[in-house]
A protein has these predicted regions:
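Bacterial signal peptide processing site
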Residues: 31-34
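Post-signal peptide N-terminal segment of mature Sec-exported envelope proteins
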Residues: 37-59
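Short amphipathic, basic-aromatic surface patches that mediate peripheral association
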Residues: 67-74
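An anionic, turn-rich surface loop/hairpin at beta-sheet edges
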Residues: 97-125
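C-terminal motif of bacterial Sec signal peptides marking the signal peptidase cleavage site
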Residues: 27-29
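Edge beta-strands of jelly-roll/beta-sandwich modules across compartments, strongly enriched
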Residues: 78, 140-151
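Noncatalytic modules at the cell exterior or secretory-pathway interfaces
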Residues: 60-67, 122-140
Length: 155
């Protein structure tokens, strides 16, 4: 003789809800702590704007921004001056100049080095999509392979 299936008791239902809630919270918190957006540039001579577009992973918390430059042994200078233009989703625009002191490449010319410099700290993005940045060297430069932005959660 089989008995009819019983529905879970209120205590079991509550425990199942808690487990499901913990599972959903664990999935939601699995966002990467860092996001990087790069743009390749002509390594022979870079003299034109290089634009990136990004959607910040976290628009509620604060983020630290780092400018990232990948370069090879052809880069013989010790500084690089960039004009950085930023455009937010609501079309607010800001442009500024940033001087980077780049250490010499310690690798053979075909291999690349990467340099990362802090750009902004504790930035709060107002929206979660539609940001654009343009990096332009103030003079033609050789040996730069790509330029971009790293966004990481503030500590």
């Amino acid at each position: 003789v089989r008995s009819a299936p019983r529905s879970p008791t209120p205590r079991k239902r509550s425990a199942m809800r808690r487990r499901m809630l913990l599972f959903v919270l664990a999935l939601a918190s699995c966002r990467p702590a860092s996001q990087i957006v790069m743009r390749d540039v002509p390594a022979l001579t870079w003299d034109s704007p290089a634009g990136i577009a990004f959607d910040p992973a976290d628009s509620l918390g604060t983020s630290d921004l780092h400018v990232v430059v990948r370069y090879n042994g052809s880069f013989r200078e010790d500084t690089l001056t960039l004009r950085i233009a930023t455009c937010s989703p609501d079309s607010l625009r800001c442009e500024e100049t940033l001087l980077l002191r780049i250490p010499p490449a310690r690798t053979a010319a075909p291999l690349r080095s990467e340099y990362r410099i802090p750009y902004r700290r504790r930035v709060r993005f107002g929206r979660s999509a539609g940001y654009r940045m343009t990096f332009t060297p103030t003079r033609p430069v050789r040996g730069i392979e790509s330029v971009g932005l790293q966004i990481e959660k503030s500590r």
